[in-house]
């Protein structure tokens, strides 16, 4: 992982979009300020918007367009309805309401969950597979998902199954840790805007500390696996990072970094991220369980983590800070 070569996701207007959607040339700034939602994806076409018009039985005016890295973002007129949501999901396009979206140009904080958000795996499941107890641990995970166990109970029970597993299993998992697409770019982009980036995780320090170091994150907190004589004891040291702990981390860091709560973002995929999402100025469900998606303010369903920057970029339009010259 060459972290010296971290690239940002440039946010800028683009002539290709203007040529594809010439109607956006003549929109007034007043109309843009009224806009309340966006659509984004890797390649937006007039045909997709015609499908949306047909399905919603109305004309959906595009007020502005810009690029965020490889993504294309459209600022939309009118209200986002459940009909819009249905057709956009079918077209595999992301969308978000943008009222009160945090301001990228002011000090900000983003707190990410780790497992299945910052990285593509659930670390405990991978450790368990290598320790030969994959199925037992997966069964406990399933019970927790069904709400039979709370997070702390399920974590302690799963970790207990790892008793006597060799410590080198952890380094095996860490060596091939698959980052979520665009995690490094998300971090680099937000750092370039002067934002702070943190991980708050019910996972393990062995992995979150590694990510903190590799990506130059500002903070990371998760659970510590007890290791004695090169073996896991099956115990977690100290207090478990719970759903409430995650929210507390966000609030404490916001205070520490002098960031207004409005300018905080929480990103996660599981039920234990909901308290943190509710505490933040903007809660984003990322490739999340339906229950989590339903309760979150907004969601990224198809994009990588660059989708979070797509949502935040909308504030630049309202402030007339978007130009042909790329930001950050």
From Swiss-Prot:
Catalysed conversion reaction: O-phospho-L-serine + H2O = L-serine + phosphate; O-phospho-D-serine + H2O = D-serine + phosphate
Names of the cofactor(s): Mg(2+)
UniProt-annotated binding residues for substrate: 122, 158, 201-202, 246, 272
GO cellular component, one term: cytoplasm
The keyword Thylakoid appears for this protein: no
Keywords, in A-Z order: Amino-acid biosynthesis, Hydrolase, Magnesium, Metal-binding, Serine biosynthesis
A GO molecular function held by the record: magnesium ion binding
Top-level taxonomic group: Bacteria
GO biological process: L-serine biosynthetic process
Active-site residues, Swiss-Prot/TrEMBL: 113, 115
Residues reported to bind Mg(2+): 113, 115, 269
EC number, UniProt record: 3.1.3.3
InterPro entries on file: HAD-like_SerB (IPR050582), HAD-like_sf (IPR036412), HAD_sf (IPR023214), PSP (IPR004469), SerB_N (IPR041449)
Biochemical pathway: Amino-acid biosynthesis; L-serine biosynthesis; L-serine from 3-phospho-D-glycerate: step 3/3
Any one Pfam family match given in the protein's UniProt record, by short name: DUF5609
Family: Belongs to the HAD-like hydrolase superfamily. SerB family.
Name this protein carries in UniProt: Phosphoserine phosphatase
Origin species: Vibrio cholerae serotype O1 (strain ATCC 39315 / El Tor Inaba N16961)
């Amino acid at each position: 992982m060459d972290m010296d070569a971290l690239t940002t996701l440039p946010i800028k207007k683009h002539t290709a979009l203007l040529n594809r959607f010439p109607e956006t040339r003549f929109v007034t700034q007043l109309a843009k300020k009224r806009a309340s939602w966006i659509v984004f994806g890797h390649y937006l076409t007039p045909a997709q918007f015609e499908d949306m018009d047909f399905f919603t039985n109305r004309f959906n005016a595009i007020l502005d367009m810009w690029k965020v890295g490889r993504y294309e973002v459209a600022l939309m007129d009118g209200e986002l309805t459940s009909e819009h949501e249905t057709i956009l999901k079918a077209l595999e396009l992301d969308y978000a309401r943008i009222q009160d979206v945090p301001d990228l140009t002011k000090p900000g904080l983003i707190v990410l969950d780790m497992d299945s958000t910052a990285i593509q795996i659930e670390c405990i499941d991978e450790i368990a597979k290598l320790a030969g107890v994959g199925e037992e641990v997966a069964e406990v995970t399933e019970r927790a998902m069904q709400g039979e166990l709370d997070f702390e109970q399920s974590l302690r029970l799963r970790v207990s199954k790892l008793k006597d597993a060799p410590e080198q299993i952890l380094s095996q998992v860490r060596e091939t840790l698959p980052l979520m697409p665009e995690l490094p770019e998300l971090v680099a982009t937000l750092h370039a805007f002067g934002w702070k980036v943190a991980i708050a995780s019910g996972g393990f320090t062995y992995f979150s500390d590694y990510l903190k170091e590799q990506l130059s994150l500002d903070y990371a907190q998760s659970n510590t696996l007890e290791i004695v004589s090169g073996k896991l004891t099956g115990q977690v040291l100290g207090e478990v990072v719970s759903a409430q702990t995650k929210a507390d981390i966000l609030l404490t860091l916001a205070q520490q970094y002098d960031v207004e709560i409005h300018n905080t973002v929480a990103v996660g995929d599981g039920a234990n991220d909901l308290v943190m999402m509710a505490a933040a100025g903007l809660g984003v469900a990322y490739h999340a369980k339906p229950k989590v998606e339903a309760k979150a303010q907004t969601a990224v369903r198809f994009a990588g983590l660059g989708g979070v920057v797509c949502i935040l970029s909308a504030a630049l339009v309202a402030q007339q800070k978007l130009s042909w010259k790329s930001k950050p």
